[in-house]
């Protein structure tokens, strides 16, 4: 029981001494704020100007919303001023030279963000202020600001944006509060490095290139007094890897697909389908672009220009493809090829485009040697052994007589005896026998045609010798000749028809090859001219966030140590 009582007394004494551990600070707080009015500007004379120094320490660049044109930042708003009512002698208060007090208990300058975009113009988290015995007050509250930032999408996604944050007193004019930058000199209102980046966390989307600040003194038409403000500028350069991989490379690939349309054969029937598919793909990219950039009419973004250029190429390729297909399926029935078209697209352009048309294979007129199995040596005067009947019949019907050499070939091919054609011709003065039926037999023809002779020769001789047999045989022969002529003419017309169709197809192929080269050159040149006009591609300046940020330096040192340990 005694030990428990001792412990309770010890704890009570400990808390009692702890509560009175800093009586000087409590006494100082009571003395400073007992008669303090936080609503009155802390100056000895109402005409005196109170100098307020302000700075900005950037912690994070949270977001740059292109579509809504809002920049979200996490900053510390550093403010300093002198309050003559908050001075004391440290010797009178046990050597206490600084005091932390709630900011709600002292006078604060009403500094707000002019270009605010979400309704909170001032600091929302009221942290404590630090009071120095000289009367100096330091207040560094954190804040998350959403400020309006005019987005310039001309070179998107290879763009640089300059956003600003404008701070100033909302009610006090320049005669009451003299607003200055923490690093400002007496002879200049411009500060080269106006934002402190020591505690900045590197952004994965933006590089900070410049952070100047400028102090402005403006006169408005409503008032005679000047109003002071400080503008903090942030020049941001986009890291383009994300948009290059997800937008630029797919767009370039789709644009070059329009070139392959002309390499696709016209007979495949897929040329128009490929063009329409490319147009639909470009439409999807247009929708993605419209979701990213603000709906501005001031300028067309770089990626939008490239998509428009690609869409024009694809649309033109559709028109050209339709024309090429029209040429490919032309025929002699509907179109006649002009001489200049034949000369230009069949003779001249193929040589320039390195197109070689396969030559047509001519049919071999000579028979193969194995056909002439029964004929070894033809006499040089074989043409004189021509049947009289063939001469006369050919003269009557305009059919050329079969040369003797061909007769020997026919005999060899058909297994007909060669001596069937080797008989001497009948004399023209040979008397015609009567209409006796016995005379039409092969043996009755004066023995000139042997039984082993070909039937055609026997029939020809019989027709020549017999007037009765001549007329019906001539009529049948005439019908046969007319049929043969019709078939031959039909085959000839068909070959000519197919030849003209092949010429049109060849012209279409030449057009395809010509437009393939034209569109390939247009795609390469257009891509280079549009993409390479972005100034940031040639800007070799290094971002300053890596130079000033202690967090970034520490991170790089850790990465370097890790890589060295790995090696």
Curated annotation (Swiss-Prot):
GO terms for molecular function: acetylcholine-gated monoatomic cation-selective channel activity; excitatory extracellular ligand-gated monoatomic ion channel activity; transmembrane signaling receptor activity; transmitter-gated monoatomic ion channel activity involved in regulation of postsynaptic membrane potential. Residues 22-240 are extracellular. The keyword DNA-binding does not apply. Glycans are attached at residues 45, 233. GO terms for cellular component: acetylcholine-gated channel complex; neuron projection; plasma membrane; postsynaptic membrane; synapse. Coiled coil: none annotated. Its main location: membrane. Residues 326-513 are cytoplasmic. CNS in embryos. It is a multi-pass membrane protein. One of its GO terms (biological process) is monoatomic ion transmembrane transport. Keywords: Cell membrane, Disulfide bond, Glycoprotein, Ion channel, Ion transport, Ligand-gated ion channel, Membrane, Postsynaptic cell membrane, Receptor, Signal, Synapse, Transmembrane, Transmembrane helix, Transport. Residues 1-21 form the signal peptide. It is found in: Postsynaptic cell membrane; Cell membrane. The chain crosses the membrane at residues 241-264, 272-290, 306-325, 514-532. Disulfide bonds join 149-163, 222-223. It comes from the Eukaryota. Belongs to the ligand-gated ion channel (TC 1.A.9) family. Acetylcholine receptor (TC 1.A.9.1) subfamily. PANTHER family: NEUROTRANSMITTER GATED ION CHANNEL (PTHR18945). After binding acetylcholine, the AChR responds by an extensive change in conformation that affects all subunits and leads to opening of an ion-conducting channel across the plasma membrane. This is Acetylcholine receptor subunit alpha-like 1. It comes from Drosophila melanogaster (Fruit fly). The gene is nAChRalpha1.
């Amino acid at each position: 029981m005694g030990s428990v009582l001792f412990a309770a007394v010890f704890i009570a004494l400990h808390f009692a001494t702890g509560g009175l551990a800093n009586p000087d600070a409590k006494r100082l707080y009571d003395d400073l704020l007992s008669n303090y009015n936080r609503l009155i500007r802390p100056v000895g004379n109402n005409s005196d100007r109170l100098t307020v120094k302000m700075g900005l320490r950037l912690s994070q660049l949270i977001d740059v919303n292109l579509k809504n044109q809002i920049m979200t930042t996490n900053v510390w708003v550093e403010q300093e001023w002198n309050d003559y009512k908050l001075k004391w002698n440290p010797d009178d208060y046990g050597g206490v030279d600084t005091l932390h007090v709630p900011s709600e208990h002292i006078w604060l300058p009403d500094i707000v963000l002019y270009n605010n975009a979400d309704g909170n113009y001032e600091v929302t988290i009221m942290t404590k202020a630090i009071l120095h015995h000289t009367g100096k007050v330091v207040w560094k509250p954190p804040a998350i600001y959403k400020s309006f930032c005019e987005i310039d999408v001309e070179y998107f996604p290879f763009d640089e944006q300059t956003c600003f944050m404008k701070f100033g007193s909302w009610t006090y004019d320049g005669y009451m509060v003299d607003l200055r930058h923490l690093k400002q000199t007496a002879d200049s209102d411009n500060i080269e490095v106006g934002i402190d980046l020591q505690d900045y966390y590197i952004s994965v989307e933006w590089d900070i290139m410049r952070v100047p600040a400028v102090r402005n003194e403006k006169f408005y038409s409503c008032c005679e007094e000047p109003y002071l403000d400080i503008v903090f500028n942030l020049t941001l350069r986009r890291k383009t890897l994300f948009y290059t991989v997800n937008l630029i490379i797919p767009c370039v690939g789709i644009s070059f697909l329009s070139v392959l349309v002309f390499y696709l054969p016209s007979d495949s029937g897929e040329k128009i389908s490929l063009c329409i598919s490319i147009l639909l793909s470009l439409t999807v990219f247009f929708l993605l672009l419209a979701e990213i950039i603000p709906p501005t009419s001031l300028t067309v973004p770089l990626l939008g220009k490239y998509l428009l250029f690609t869409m024009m190429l694809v649309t033109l390729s559709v028109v050209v493809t339709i024309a090429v297909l029209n040429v490919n399926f032309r025929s002699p029935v509907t179109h006649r090829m002009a001489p200049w078209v034949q000369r230009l697209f069949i003779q001249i352009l193929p040589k320039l485009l390195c197109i070689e048309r396969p030559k047509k294979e001519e049919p071999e007129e000579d028979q193969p040697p194995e056909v002439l199995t029964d004929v070894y040596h033809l006499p040089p005067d074989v043409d004189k052994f021509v049947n009289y009947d063939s001469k006369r019949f050919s003269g009557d019907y305009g059919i050329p007589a079969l040369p003797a050499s061909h007769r020997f070939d026919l005999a060899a091919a058909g297994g007909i005896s060669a001596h069937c054609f080797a008989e001497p011709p009948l004399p023209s003065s040979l008397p015609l026998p009567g209409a006796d039926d016995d005379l039409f037999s092969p043996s009755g023809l004066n023995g000139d045609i042997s039984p082993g002779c070909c039937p055609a020769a026997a029939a020809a001789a019989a027709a020549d010798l017999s007037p009765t047999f001549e007329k019906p045989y001539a009529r049948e022969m005439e019908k046969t000749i007319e049929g043969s002529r019709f078939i031959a003419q039909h085959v000839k017309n068909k070959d000519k028809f197919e030849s003209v169709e092949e010429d049109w197809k060849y012209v279409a192929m030449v057009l395809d090859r010509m437009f393939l080269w034209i569109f390939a050159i247009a795609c390469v040149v257009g891509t280079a001219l549009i993409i390479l006009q972005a100034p940031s591609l040639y800007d070799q300046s290094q971002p300053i966030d890596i130079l000033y940020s202690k967090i970034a330096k520490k991170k790089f040192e850790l990465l370097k140590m890790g890589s060295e340990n790995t090696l």
